[in-house]
Amino acid sequence: FGELPLADAIKIVRGKGERVLAVFSDPDCPYCRRLESELDKLDNVTLYTFPYPLEGLHPEARDKSIAVWCAANRAQAWAELMKSGKAPASRKCDHPIERNIQLGQRLGIQGTPTLLSAYGRILPGAAPKERIEQWLLEAGR
């Protein structure tokens, strides 16, 4: 986890943010949207969301990821996109989307969503809040 380029992720802090996890997520993935609603229920957590478009499945996901990254408020733009499916207006800026794709491939992430704990544990799929809480406890042992 310490080797993740956290500057290439969208950072969201809830509560004190003492628990840390990374999420690889595709903006057009229905399971990612389901996970996002579960992550919204977590407290005392810092989330690093790496936009990870799976272009073979979702051909518009890359452009949406870039639009979110280039938005004035990335966290708000991501939340809006995941809740409503509405992407922000397209803009151009330097973005990490290609690096995120390469990073995910290097880490062996084959599907979205995928969670990574600060201790290197992986939880694939759209788990409910209770499962994520349990996983965070186990990951810290």
Regions found by a protein language model. Give the residues of each.
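Long C-terminal interaction/binding lobes of large macromolecular proteins
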Residues: 113
